[in-house]
C-alpha cells in the first residue's frame, strides 16, 4: 500500500505544488497553516525538518522566513519537482534549504535524536499510513528527531468532511460502494475509487494518537473550517472582496472551535515535544 501512495504522488507532483493556490478552500488551508506555524515558531532562525513536504510549498516559505530547512518526502516525483523548483527560488531560500532528501516518515534513522528545533508533517502524511502501527512509528519518529520542548506541526485528513462531501456532491456510486462504509466504520480506504490509500481521522482519534505517544497537543485547527468541501460556493464568494473578508473573519473566529475542527477537510495539531 505504501508503494501505491508513492506511485500516486510520483505522478501528482505538479498538481500538488499548485493544489493550495488552485481555489479559495485550498488557499484557506495554506494561509491558516502558515499562520499557526508562525504563531508558535520564534522569529530567530531555527533548524526545521519538513517531512512529507512534497514539492516544497511550506519548506520554501520557512526558508524565506530565515529558518534552516531540510525537505524530505517519500515520493521521488515530489523530490525531483522540489529540486527543480528550488533552482528558481531567491538566493535567501536557496541558502536556507539545507537538503532535499527521500525519506519514509516511519524510519528517519538518517537523523539523530533531537536533530531539529521543530518539525513539520503537513498535508495528510500520517493519513496515508493505513497500519496503525505505522502511524505510531511515525509519531515516535517525529518526537525522536525533534528537540525537547520543540513544536511539531501535524495535519491529517478529516473523516467527517470526506463523508459529507460524498453526500453533498451526490456521489451515488461511491456511496453504494463498500469503501464508503469502510470509511464510516473507521476502516481504511484503499484508493480504488480515486485519490489514494488513506486513513481518515476523527479529531478525538487524532488527539489520542498524539497524546498516547508522548506529544502534548497545544491547539487543534480546522484548516479549511466552515468552507470545507465548498469549493464552488467559496469561489462565488471569493470574487466579492468585502464578502470574502467577512468569511476570513468568521474563519479566524471559528477555525479552532471543536465542531469546526472535526468537520474540516484537514485538521492541524500544534504539538509540543513534552
Language-model regions: role of each:
Residues 208, 219-274:
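A C-terminal cap/extension of S-adenosyl-L-methionine-dependent methyltransferases
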Residues 57-107:
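Class I SAM-dependent methyltransferase SAM/SAH-binding core
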Residues 1-54, 57, 61, 151-181:
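Conserved class I S-adenosyl-L-methionine
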Amino acid at each position: 500500500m505504501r508503494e501505491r501512495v508513492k506511485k500516486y504522488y510520483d505522478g501528482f507532483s505538479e498538481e500538488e505544488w499548485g493544489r493550495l493556490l488552485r481555489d479559495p478552500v485550498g488557499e484557506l488551508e495554506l494561509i491558516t497553516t502558515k499562520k499557526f506555524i508562525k504563531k508558535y515558531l520564534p522569529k530567530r532562525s531555527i533548524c526545521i525538518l519538513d517531512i512529507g513536504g512534497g514539492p516544497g510549498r511550506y519548506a520554501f516559505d520557512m526558508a524565506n522566513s530565515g529558518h534552516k530547512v531540510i525537505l524530505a518526502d517519500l515520493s521521488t516525483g515530489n523530490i525531483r519537482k522540489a529540486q527543480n523548483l528550488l533552482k528558481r527560488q531567491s538566493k535567501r531560500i536557496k541558502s536556507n534549504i539545507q537538503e532535499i532528501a527521500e525519506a519514509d516518515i516511519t524510519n528517519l534513522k538518517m537523523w539523530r535524536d533531537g536533530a531539529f528545533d521543530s518539525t513539520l508533517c503537513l498535508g495528510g502524511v500520517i493519513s496515508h499510513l493505513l497500519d496503525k502501527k505505522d502511524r505510531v512509528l511515525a509519531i515516535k519518529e517525529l518526537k525522536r528527531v525533534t528537540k525537547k520542548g520543540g513544536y511539531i506541526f501535524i495535519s491529517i485528513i478529516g473523516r467527517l468532511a470526506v463523508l459529507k462531501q460524498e453526500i453533498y456532491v451526490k456521489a451515488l456510486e461511491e456511496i453504494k460502494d463498500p469503501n464508503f462504509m469502510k470509511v464510516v466504520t473507521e476502516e481504511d480506504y484503499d484508493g480504488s475509487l480515486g485519490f489514494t490509500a488513506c486513513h481518515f481521522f476523527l479529531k478525538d482519534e487524532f488527539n489520542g494518537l498524539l497524546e498516547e505517544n508522548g506529544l502534548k497537543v497545544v491547539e487543534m485547527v480546522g484548516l479549511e473550517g466552515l468552507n470545507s468541501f465548498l469549493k464552488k460556493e467559496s469561489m462565488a464568494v471569493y470574487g466579492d472582496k468585502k464578502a470574502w473578508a467577512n468569511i476570513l473573519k468568521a474563519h479566524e473566529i471559528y477555525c479552532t472551535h471543536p465542531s469546526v475542527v472535526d468537520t474540516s477537510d484537514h485538521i492541524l495539531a500544534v504539538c509540543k515535544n513534552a
